[in-house]
Design a protein with these regions (language model features):
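Long, terminal "pre-/pro-" and other extracytoplasmic accessory regions
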Residues: 1-245
Length: 245
């Protein structure tokens, strides 16, 4: 997966605050609208793990899925398919555009693709929310698409619903140049941008510095307030996608 794809944990779903409760019928209607090509849907059960939801089984675009819709707000928490896709008729580049358009049309706002992986005929893409050009890694959405026909066959929006809200972010205490100086002489910076990353207890505004040692590429996260190195990850690119370790 991409950086911070595990996200943060908690019980306050910030993206749902202020939203009204929905009925089971309203949740089903929201799920139909979300996928748009639902040929069959049935209610499974109510659940409270990790949040109060209505669970459904459905078939959309010829793919069977299980899905959950939040009782508060009627938002899709997840939709998962066990489809076995072996045929590949579309490229990753084509599907990156498809997935971004899918999210935009469903009201997720400014999102940016960070990393993706391919397993057989299924492409999984991580998108992070963006606020004023700053990446919000806690507000992550994963989208799965069939490379056979471009259908969206999976969504994991739990991190997004848990964390997404406008932030009041402090101005960095360090400049980009000062942050780059913290990564050490063995690495050469390629690109720098501000990002919010999850921590054990909260979040931190960091400079995300993409850097290389001449052979490998790394992501170094320098705390924009203290200058401390928060994270160091290696970027791996191959035929399966772009991942971090």
């Amino acid at each position: 997966d991409g950086p911070f794809s595990d996200g943060a944990t908690g019980d306050r779903y910030r993206a749902l605050e202020g939203m009204n409760a929905v009925t089971r019928d309203e949740a089903e209607k929201a799920l139909r609208a979300y996928f748009g090509n639902v040929s069959e849907i049935h209610f499974v059960q109510e659940s409270s793990v990790p949040i109060e939801v209505y669970e459904f089984g459905l078939t959309a675009g010829g793919y069977s899925m299980s899905a959950a819709v939040t009782k508060q707000g009627g938002q899709v928490l997840y939709a998962l398919s066990d489809a076995d896709v072996s045929e590949t008729n579309m490229t990753a580049e084509q599907l990156l555009d498809t997935a971004r358009a899918f999210l935009l049309a469903r009201g997720y706002g400014a999102m940016e693709m960070r990393y993706y992986s391919r397993y057989e005929g299924i492409l999984t893409i991580n998108y992070a929310a963006v606020q004023d050009g700053i990446l919000l890694y806690p507000d992550l959405v994963k989208v799965q698409l069939s490379m056979a026909d471009g259908a969206v066959i999976g969504v994991e929006a739990g991190n997004y619903l848990l964390n997404h809200a406008p932030r009041v972010l402090p101005a960095p205490s360090l400049t980009e140049e000062e942050a780059i100086a913290r990564i050490g002489s063995q690495l050469t910076a390629i690109a720098v941008r501000l990002s919010v990353i999850p921590t054990a207890v909260s979040e931190a505004l960091c400079y995300e510095i993409r850097a290389t040692d001449g052979a490998d590429t790394f992501l170094v996260y320098i705390d924009a307030a203290t200058g401390a190195e928060r994270e160091l990850m290696q970027v791996v690119s191959d035929e399966s996608g772009i991942l971090v370790m």
